[in-house]
Amino acid sequence: MRADGNLTQWAAPGFPDDTLLLRDIARGGGFVIESVIPSEAKESLVAYFALLPSPEPTYDYIDGAWLTDAPYGVIHRMASYPDVHGIFTAVLDFAAARYAHLRIDTHRDNHIMQHLIEKHNFTYCGIIWLEDGTERLAYER
């Protein structure tokens, strides 16, 4: 993220930390993806994401409007190895098989994630705020 100009998202040392990831896993929503890293030619852990059921407390207030009030799945903490392609598509396929409606948010400076979100037919819905007061761009499909 830093190399692409996103200097502030996940800037806190150790974020996301083990406690948060273990909480995702305990809720049945922490997932890893294994694949072959081209430069290493061996199977490795290449991505992590959380797919959690609604409600998401930080989505209760939005400066804008959600597309629906129906139950949804929310994708959080999407992180992947940069040289392995197709991860986001695989995550969305996995999520869409489980939820009719999906929501996701990202940092204003995370242009790569914004591009991927919009490319995969999400609609920009507005701005939400995290518990620490930082804003995120929010999307739904």
Tell me what each language-model feature is.
Residues 18-32, 54-56:
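A short helix-loop-beta-strand connector motif used in the catalytic cores of GNAT acetyltransferases and
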Residues 27-51:
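Conserved beta-hairpin
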Residues 50-83:
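Conserved acyl-donor/pantetheine-binding loop and adjacent beta-alpha core of acyl/acetyltransferases
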